[in-house]
UniProtKB/Swiss-Prot annotation:
It catalyses: (S)-4-hydroxy-2-oxopentanoate = acetaldehyde + pyruvate. Transmembrane segments: none annotated. HAMAP family: HOA (MF_01656). It is an enzyme of class 4 (lyase). This is 4-hydroxy-2-oxovalerate aldolase 3. It comes from Dechloromonas aromatica (strain RCB). Belongs to the 4-hydroxy-2-oxovalerate aldolase family. GO terms for biological process: catabolic process; L-leucine biosynthetic process. Its EC number is 4.1.3.39. The record marks 15 as: Transition state stabilizer. Substrate binds at residues 15-16, 169, 198, 289. The active site is at residue 19.
Amino acid sequence: MNPNKKIYISDVTLRDGSHAIRHQYSVENAVQIARALDKAKVDSIEVAHGDGLQGSSFNYGFGAHTDLEWIEAVADTVKHAKVATLLLPGIGTVHDLKAAYSAGARIVRVATHCTEADVSRQHIEVARNLGMEAVGFLMMSHMTTPQALAEQAKLMESYGATCCYVVDSGGALSMNDVRDRFRAFKEVLKPETETGIHAHHNLSLGVANSIVAVEEGCDRVDASLSGMGAGAGNAPLEVFIAAADRMGWNHGCNLYTLMDAADDIVRPLQDRPVRVDRETLALGYAGVYSSFLRHSEVAAKKYGLKAVDILVELGRRRMVGGQEDMIVDVALDLLKGHEHDAEHAIPTMSEAG
């Protein structure tokens, strides 16, 4: 890698971080966080419901505000950073993309499952026609091979994406997994096409994986204040910047401003600690979509189950983002299995009298 190359810092506190508090950021929260990030000189700030434009729904959870309210508030606040947003084809539409652009978004990350890049074409093309920066975002990147993932990135590039991401939605990639995926990208993408890493911290590898990605030539790094994000969170922004600083990398951010924002503004908003614990570790171990965490915990409480059991079964069934409705199905199947086991249990001597 070129140590003098400027690493593009993409903050996701106001989008992925929304998962951690069930999409309940107030507009005031968004403005305060955006102001701090802008002061710290991050390059972009992603803003949306955790599941992207129009994610606010019964299936994913309703947001405290609309995407446009958040985007407009942040766009009116920042002076340095570009406003980005996320769109999942099938949830967000071209109409929503145009509205986000009008509200102030200038970058869109079009997100698909890692084997379904073909559904991104319309949205990437429309984004480019609007004058937006279009980024391809390949979620659950651990679920396919490095070479197959690279071919999907090549499709997004052909549609007009100027940057393609390895997205570790489950926080399941090891450092060698990340290295192999970026090397595969390098083999097939044009030299001018940038690459990005979106890490989750479920195996405590969020920062390490981001560092490996940069060592392999990755241009953009996603991170969030105090790791605010789904599951055990994303790569903590202030930690990545501190590590990058120690390595002499050019990132352009003010570390102490980020440290203050993480501890004084973001961490107090968490109603469930964003950390590696029994449940979030299960996400990374089983390779489960990180935003399934809060939904699974609700289902576990409702049906008297362990959230870990639900998460591991979701991983076994290879469920992916967008299948949140299956969490209740899995819980009911597990409950039925427990009831069957109890009904057919062999009585002990004391129970038999």
